[in-house]
């Protein structure tokens, strides 16, 4: 009994957690059809996710219906995992931009992305724990969230699509360890299930800051 109980305890690791959401996925599928448009959008995203994860420590890929939960791991450094995750997300946005130039507007793939870092329980093809929930709360932040925030940016400064948000933990890592990206506070938010206000940042490429 003791051995069985021990075997059921999940491994705990520190990983970079990425949540990717397809903007207006359900609306697009309902309007233009899942088989005509929606399925191809999801297939393209899945292909991109597989490619960007190669060589960057991608360990978990789970569909959320309208996007993906991804985690990245580096055995030497959790901070390196956060940098790899950021690199992967911006490569994903780059490929998405190229793709969108070649398809009709209704087939465009537009994303919202969020990056966090923290301890997670490793379960088969999934991750569990409060840090996973936190990453989903980050991704859910939109222009509509700004009026309730402290010291928010102007709504027009937050794009409607194809942007990256991150937690304070990830912002600190990027500012210390990378010259490729900068971070900009968008305000302090109350995130459902988490106490107090949490500062949230937008991640920007230094090569293309806007």
Give residue ranges: language-model regions.
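Short, glycine/charged-enriched secondary-structure capping and boundary segments
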Residues: 32-35, 127-131, 179-181
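Catalytic NTP-binding/metal-coordinating core of nucleotidyl cyclase/transferase enzymes
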Residues: 2-87
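Intrinsically disordered, glycine/charged-rich C-terminal tails and inter-domain linkers
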Residues: 1-9, 14, 151-210
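Short loop/turn motifs enriched for small/polar and acidic residues
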Residues: 66, 114-120, 167-169
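A generic fold-level signal
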Residues: 10-12, 63, 108-110, 127-129, ...
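A generic structural signal for short hydrophobic patches within well-formed alpha-helices
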Residues: 25-28, 120, 170-171
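Alpha-helical scaffold within the catalytic cores of cyclic-nucleotide enzymes
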Residues: 39-58, 74-113, 117-119, 130-146
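Short, solvent-exposed loop/turn segments at secondary-structure junctions
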Residues: 71, 119-124, 147, 173
């Amino acid at each position: 009994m003791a051995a069985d109980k021990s075997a059921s305890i999940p491994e705990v690791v520190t990983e970079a957690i990425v949540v990717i959401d397809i903007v207006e996925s359900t609306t697009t599928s309902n309007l233009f059809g899942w088989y005509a448009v929606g399925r191809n959008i999801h297939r393209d995203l899945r292909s991109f996710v597989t490619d960007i994860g190669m060589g960057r420590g991608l360990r978990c890929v789970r569909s959320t219906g309208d996007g993906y939960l991804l985690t990245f791991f580096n055995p030497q450094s959790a901070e390196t995992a956060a940098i790899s995750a950021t690199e992967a997300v911006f490569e994903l946005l780059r490929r998405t931009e190229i793709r969108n130039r070649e398809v009709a507007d209704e087939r465009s793939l537009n994303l919202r992305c969020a990056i966090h870092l923290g301890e997670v329980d490793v379960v088969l093809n999934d991750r569990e724990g409060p840090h996973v929930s936190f990453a989903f709360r980050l991704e859910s932040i939109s222009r509509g969230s700004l009026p309730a925030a402290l010291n928010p940016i102007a709504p027009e400064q937050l794009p409607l699509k194809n942007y990256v948000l991150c937690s304070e933990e990830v912002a600190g890592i990027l500012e210390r360890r990378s010259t490729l990206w900068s971070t900009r506070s968008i305000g302090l938010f109350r995130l459902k299930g988490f106490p107090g206000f949490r500062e949230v940042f937008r991640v920007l490429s230094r090569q293309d800051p806007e």
